[in-house]
From Swiss-Prot:
Keyword Transcription regulation belongs to the record: yes
Coiled-coil residue windows: none
Protein name per UniProt: Major cold shock protein
UniProt source species: Photobacterium leiognathi subsp. mandapamensis
Domain CSD: 1-46
Annotated compartments: Cytoplasm
Pfam families: CSD (PF00313)
InterPro entries per the UniProt record, alphabetical: Cold_shock_CspA, CSD, CSD_CS, CSP_DNA-bd, NA-bd_OB-fold
Main localization category: cytoplasm
Quaternary structure (record): Homodimer.
Keywords: Activator, Cytoplasm, DNA-binding, Stress response, Transcription, Transcription regulation
CC terms in the record's Gene Ontology section: cytosol
Induction: In response to low temperature.
Length: 46
């Protein structure tokens, strides 16, 4: 809805900010609450 959100890590680490541009998928880029994903954490500009 907003184009951004946060991912919760399984290892208990801090939540990770994610922007829709970082989603690697075709078509409409969206995630749903509770959806399992894999990701690499990168430091970006704020």
């Amino acid at each position: 809805e907003k184009g951004f959100g946060f991912l919760t890590q399984n290892n208990g680490g801090a939540d990770v900010f994610v922007h829709f541009r970082a989603i690697a998928s075709e078509g409409f880029k969206t995630l749903t609450e509770g959806q399992k994903v894999s990701f690499d954490v990168e430091q970006g500009q704020k």
